[in-house]
UniProtKB/Swiss-Prot annotation:
Compartments, record wording: Plastid, Chloroplast thylakoid membrane
One Gene Ontology cellular component: chloroplast thylakoid membrane
Protein's name in the database: Photosystem II reaction center protein M
Subunit structure, interactors included: PSII is composed of 1 copy each of membrane proteins PsbA, PsbB, PsbC, PsbD, PsbE, PsbF, PsbH, PsbI, PsbJ, PsbK, PsbL, PsbM, PsbT, PsbX, PsbY, PsbZ, Psb30/Ycf12, at least 3 peripheral proteins of the oxygen-evolving complex and a large number of cofactors. It forms dimeric complexes.
Membrane topology qualifier: Single-pass membrane protein
Membrane spanning residue stretches: 5-25
Family membership: Belongs to the PsbM family.
Keywords recorded for this protein, A-Z: Chloroplast, Membrane, Photosynthesis, Photosystem II, Plastid, Reaction center, Thylakoid, Transmembrane, Transmembrane helix
Organism this protein belongs to: Huperzia lucidula (Shining clubmoss)
Principal subcellular localization: plastid
Length: 34
């Protein structure tokens, strides 16, 4: 079974980018509350 590297990278970026973005927003709001 051949793994499509480009599809794997695209899926990883599609998941990691929104997760990292929301995590950064959470850290910023948490630091502002403190």
């Amino acid at each position: 079974m051949e793994v499509n590297i480009l599809a794997f990278i695209a899926t990883a970026l599609f998941i990691l980018i929104p997760t990292a973005f929301s995590l950064i927003l959470y850290v910023q709001t948490a630091s502002q509350n403190n």
